[in-house]
Amino acid sequence: RLNDLLKAITQHYIDRGYVTSRAYLPQQDLADGELDVIVVEGRLEGVEGSAIASDRELALASPAQTGEPLNLRELEQLVEQINRLPSRPAELELVPGSDVGGSRVQLKGEPGKPWRVGFNRHNDGQRSTGEQQWGASLEWDSPLGLADQLSLRAGGDAVSDRWRHSANQSFAYSLPYGWWSFSYAYSQSYYRMRTQGQGFPFVSDGESKTHQLRADRVLHRDSISKTGLSLGLAHLETRNYIENALLGSSSPRITETQLGFNHGRRLGSAFVNLDLGWQQGIGALDAKNSRIDGKSGTNARYDKYSLTASYLQPFQLLGENLSFDSLINYQRSEDELNSPQRISIGGLSSVRGFKDQSLSGNSGGYWRNQLRWTRPVDWAPLQPFVRQYGLAFAYDLGQIQGDRNNARSHGRLSGNALEFSARGPNLAVSLTFARSLERPDVIERQEHPIYARIDLFY
């Protein structure tokens, strides 16, 4: 019974991450009817990063403190912060320390190239602003030696003319600090398109700029789950023109606060993730007044609520590797939102099967489902270029609720798709054949889009 008691006490510590703590019975006289149990709380004597991380990077990324009881959850957080850099595949190893119950942590792994460049070409653009699109990216791990990350991206239409053009650029930077992660992102975009009015063509163009600050905090983690909270502040400025005349009613300046909750969990071999969000428009940073446009009634002091839930289940059938994934994205607002805050469905990233036609509204959502089969390439001459190929079948559906600004443009969309894909060390290609199924009357025609994409990366 005493052994069972000691095991229970030790297990209590282990379940909370104190894997080097142990309970034992010292020599004692039980004549007084009291039992003394001593717990040796294993201490952390230090963390060694070797080539995978410098001392400065470890100091920022690790919530664990030397001399404190060793907690595996803190060390898992450290490894996760380092592993978020693709060039730092770190693994954890505990080695005995110099003191009784003490342990040292060694991070094992070989660092890779700290930067990555990528180029892509696809046809997922809009016909009005350029269907054929290109993109380029640069990622740099730990540019300041702080386990930080820098990302630069740019893209645009591959064929421009007087009537059609689009371009976009973005910058992102993230910095870890123990249980926290801080990030800043900036993006800007420009479009030019042809519009028709009273039988005459006009040039319509516009630009948008977005700044976002965000802080993420891990609240709890154990061997199968992680829970976190995020706080953010975003500022968006949009300017739209017709023949160089500013359209004030559709050119808002919006500032919003963001509060998010995240919970991820492993269920057997499956993975489940839940994100809840609340966004509120405020008047800071020169945001416009509550009523931006008296005609449309769009509101810059809005409240918007969002939910995203995902499920991934890998499995094998008859010796083949398969996976099923499902994602639900939903938002709701009782306020009239400007276009950037509204939810849109119809396209490769929401309801496949639609490309030139879509629905948007204050409230709505979509549900994506996909069954994927993958197989490694066995033919040796092809392996330097392609390591894996696969096939996926998808079925998506979405719903937009009616509101003041879309009395007709609401309803339900659904579509399916068949995707062929291949991937190698420096190459990824995909070809997707999609078909629209359900659509409301406002969506005038059925679509059969074909999405093609090629990515080169180094």
Regions found by a protein language model. Name each.
Residues G67, H122-D124, D157-V159, Q196-V203, ...:
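Extracellular loop and loop/strand-boundary signature of outer-membrane beta-barrel proteins
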Residues R239-L397, Q401, E444:
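C-terminal outer-membrane beta-barrel translocator/porin domains of Gram-negative envelope proteins
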